[in-house]
Amino acid sequence: NFAIAPPGVGRFRVNAFVQQGRIGMVLRTITTDIPKFEELGLPPVLKDVIMSKRGIMMFVGATGCGKSTSMASLLGYRNENSYVHIITIEDPIEFVHQHRNCIVTQREVGVDTDGWNVALKNTLRQAPDVILIGEVRERETMDYAISFAETGHLCLATLHANSTNQALDRIINFFPEERRSQLLMDLSLNLKGVISQRLIP
């Protein structure tokens, strides 16, 4: 997984692979302009949530349904309406944010850091206010998201799930039975919202 940006052509998210002994790849176009909140028709309440000091926002939906676009739009809104340090950890970086009122630090797994856990382990040492985790795939990553919220940071993340109910089931099932009681307490105190997206044909 990586991103490329040939001059004069555009920016693309790429997945390269081998099939039948040959190289194959899939490219998805990434718009270079970060869409405005109003252009996407996002619920107005999300403006309040993205301006929160702390908590967790989860975006869920199938691959290609616009989770990254919505998060980029919300970060763009925060970038223009507050004065904080935003850190994103992505695989790969999709939307490139310019510094507006905020300082935006973007780290790509495999390029700027060896792995998710290495990047997440050191994130709090970089004095963030808002942290974007490109994707929650395992318990350790979810642990970091909860820890970030508990220490006074706003954390945005994506998760592959078809609905908000399924997203919560997946999060709960990341953890062993003996930890679930504490997990539910942590989520009740820190989860600001689960936003489920589906593209309309």
Predicted regions located by residue number:
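Short, flexible helix-loop junctions that flank or precede catalytic/ligand sites
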Residues: 1-201
